[in-house]
């Protein structure tokens, strides 16, 4: 079993220099064209309310494009320049798209209740919040989105001063209609992402954008990047050394991409630029394929256990991580040994194979520690590595 575990955790010692600069993986926003919708028709309050009411019905695409045009038209340019200049400064290519004729008044209006809350004083905030909420469907499926609306939307909307969003229609049929027109790579999706980036550029409203959508829009891969950076800081470890200690053979390809992405994000000036890089992958059709994130649950589990030793409560996030119970115990022990290894001074210490051998021995002993709090099922036995290495 020890040899199988060592084989699984191969590390990245064979990956040097130029191999990390994978030419087949492009993360830069310059590969993305962001549409800026505009309307030749004056967008009065009644037209905006009609568009809001039709989101989630057969007129969803037209309604959302008109709402994008309204937000762009109403956004006040910052000191950094116009809306277009801000997005171009982040490296995106822009194109202007006419929304065409106004929405048909005969379309169904599943979000009429939300539309009725709109007045002149709150129209921009409500419409922007609605776009942010709809954008979550680029990541969540209908069931997860319904759960999000039920459990989180009211609290987040109220905390960000857009309590009207509690009237958003979270019926699964309505969510399915919205999700059908918002997919990575589609023009409407890119237009909404452009609006998110504009909001992130303004310190006065950046917190709202982050709270309602941006942190979720960055994708699982960026969650792991954040955990990795936090763990490296906590340990005082060189990122390359820590990555070698964590990396399993099955995730080497994904790790290459994550290493490169971390480098680019670290060099990006300002929060909007950092999210611009992150989102540039979400805006392409190949985003979910680009990271082998399903294989990275084990690494995430170890990182959370490391960070929990410095920030109590981090490990509560492990509830949603699907790994087997034996690996949960192993992850805690690996985290403990990594803390001892680095001890805040970045020492290289023993190699990954020896560290994992010691962790495995300790995790099987009687002094492993408290019982697991989670009641989750073990991994699917068909997932690579689990049944052979950890059972």
Swiss-Prot record:
GO terms for cellular component: helical viral capsid; host cell cytoplasm; ribonucleoprotein complex; viral nucleocapsid. The keyword S-adenosyl-L-methionine does not apply. Transmembrane segments: none annotated. Residues 368-391 have a biased composition (Acidic residues). Keywords: Capsid protein, Helical capsid protein, Host cytoplasm, Phosphoprotein, Ribonucleoprotein, RNA-binding, Viral nucleoprotein, Virion. It is found in: Virion; Host cytoplasm. One of its GO terms (molecular function) is RNA binding. The keyword RNA-binding applies. It comes from the Viruses. Its main location: virion. Residues 346-391 are annotated as: Disordered. InterPro entries: Rhabdo_ncap_2 (IPR004902). Belongs to the novirhabdovirus nucleocapsid protein family. Homomultimerizes to form the nucleocapsid. Binds to viral genomic RNA. Encapsidates the genome, protecting it from nucleases. If expressed without protein P it binds non-specifically RNA and therefore can bind it's own mRNA. Interaction with protein P abolishes any non-specific RNA binding, and prevents phosphorylation. The soluble N-P complex encapsidates specifically the genomic RNA, with protein N protecting the genome like a pearl necklace. The encapsidated genomic RNA is termed the nucleocapsid (NC) and serves as template for viral transcription and replication. Protein N binds protein P in the NC through a different interaction, and can be phosphorylated. This is Nucleoprotein. It comes from Infectious hematopoietic necrosis virus (strain WRAC) (IHNV). The gene is N.
């Amino acid at each position: 079993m020890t040899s199988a575990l060592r084989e699984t955790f191969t590390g990245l010692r064979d990956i040097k220099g130029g191999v990390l600069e994978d030419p087949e993986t492009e993360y830069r926003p310059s590969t993305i064209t962001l549409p800026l919708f505009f309307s030749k028709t004056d967008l009065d309050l009644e037209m905006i309310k009609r568009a809001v009411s039709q989101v989630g019905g057969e007129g969803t695409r037209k309604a959302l494009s008109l709402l994008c045009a309204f937000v762009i038209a109403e956004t006040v340019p910052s000191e950094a320049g116009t809306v277009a200049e801000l997005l171009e400064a982040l490296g995106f290519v822009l194109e202007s798209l006419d929304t065409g004729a106004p929405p048909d008044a005969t379309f169904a209006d599943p979000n009429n209740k939300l539309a009725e809350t709109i007045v002149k004083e709150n129209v921009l905030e409500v419409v922007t919040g609605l776009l942010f909420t709809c954008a979550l469907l680029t990541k969540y499926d209908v069931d997860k989105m319904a759960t999000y609306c039920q459990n989180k939307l009211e609290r987040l909307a109220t905390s960000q001063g857009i309590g009207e969003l509690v009237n958003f229609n979270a019926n699964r049929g309505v969510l399915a209609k919205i999700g059908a027109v918002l997919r990575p790579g589609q023009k409407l999706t890119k237009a909404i992402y452009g609006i998110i980036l504009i909001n992130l550029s303004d310190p006065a409203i950046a917190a709202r954008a982050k709270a309602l959508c941006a942190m979720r829009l960055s994708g699982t891969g960026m969650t792991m990047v954040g955990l990795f950076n936090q763990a490296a800081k906590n340990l005082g470890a060189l990122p390359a050394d820590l990555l070698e200690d964590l990396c399993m053979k099955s995730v080497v390809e994904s790790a290459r991409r994550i290493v490169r992405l971390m480098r680019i994000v670290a060099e990006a000036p300002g929060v909007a630029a950092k999210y611009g890089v992150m989102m540039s992958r979400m805006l392409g059709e190949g985003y979910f394929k680009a990271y082998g994130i399903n294989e990275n649950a084990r690494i995430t589990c170890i990182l959370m256990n490391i960070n929990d030793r410095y920030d109590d409560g981090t490990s509560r996030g492990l509830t949603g991580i699907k790994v087997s119970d034996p690996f949960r115990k192993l992850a805690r022990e690996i985290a403990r040994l990594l803390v001892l290894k680095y001890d805040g001074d970045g020492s290289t210490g023993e190699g990954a194979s020896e560290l994992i051998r010691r962790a495995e021995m300790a995790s099987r002993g009687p002094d492993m520690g408290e019982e697991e709090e989670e009641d989750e099922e073990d991994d699917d036995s068909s997932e690579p590595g689990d049944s052979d290495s950890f059972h």
